[in-house]
Amino acid sequence: MTDERTPGIRLPSLRELSREQRDLLEEAVGSRLLVTGPPGSGKTIMALHRAEKLLRANRISKLLTFNKVLTAYVTNAMQSLGLPSQSASTYHSWAWRWHSETFGGRPPTRNDDQYDIDWMAIARRLQQVPEQEAQYLFIDEGQDFPKTFYQVLDLIRPTDLTVFADENQRITPINSTIEEIRTALDIDVDDVIELRKNYRNTRPIAEVAARFHVRGIDTGIPELPDRLGTTPSYHALGTLQEQCVFITRYARNNPSLEIGVFVQRRDRQPQVFSCIQSNIQSNSPTISIHMYMQGDAQHGDAVALRMGLAGIKVLNDKSAKGTEFDTVFLVDVDTRKTNSHDEDAMTMFVLCSRPRTSLYFLGNASAFPDSLARARDLIECA
């Protein structure tokens, strides 16, 4: 059962929260907390409910995310909770706005990259700025933010700060470990809260995802869920067209489901989208299909994805973080990297953790793909 105030978004009501989640929600306003937990443990849900708690206390909070797709997702949920639509923001948008209000002008950047903010230069300037007004901040997917950002946050000293992070989902070039976040924010070890249970996946999906977990990382594998389901499967299809026909047929047979299609390469993404769209127009015109590509003139609006509603969403790997779908398809898995590096395994860990019910791997090769070798015994070859 989901909260009826949240059309399309599966947001549990307060009475449906677990004991560990309720304990987090009951932490006093004015706390500085670090919450760790793997995919499906409810980190984003807890950020939303704590933001709602602050609103009831007449305190307006801001929830920062790293990518626009997750921002669009949480914006929909926030509006349904009665939170202002501007309560959610990407990290970069917030940083530019905050710098303009604090110092005037654009923030200093490094290497002629507008997204690589020079937080150390900002830290030096903060010594000359009066004390900041009260701020209530939640940071989701905090492992994707640079550690220098947290050092500046420590100087700003928000009135209430909660960081949600999973070290095993660091798939961006600039990132932070759990220990780096804790140290930068001077958070006591006792104020690090760990969420353990997986509320999203079926057990077969969670078992596959766990095979791509990188050992020796502070954020652990979640407790395996009890919910049973179908075994994730690999389908060897001869061409991209056949992969797209497979996806379209599935969507036609399951019109009420939200389906995520993940593509590794950005240059391949429009081909996959156009191929599926063409099949839909020919055979299933009632199915909705959307795509998000950052910076693209036609498909650069994450809000247009209508996250949480039925239909097909075509995304690339970098937009996967924080999302969830009923069913997920990974296309071209036979051309993916072979997970010889931790970054490749982390990406697969993130992708395999997105579906609630069904996970399909599609490729052109008849041989079992090297990219899935870690979970070969858990994946059915159809």
Walk through the language-model features, giving the residues of each.
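Conserved helicase motor core of SF1/SF2 NTP-dependent helicases
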Residues: R5-S100, E131-Q132, Y136, Q143-A382
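Conserved P-loop NTPase mechanochemical-coupling segment
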Residues: W94-D116
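Mid-core helix/loop region of P-loop NTP-binding domains shared across ATPases and GTPases
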Residues: D113-Y136
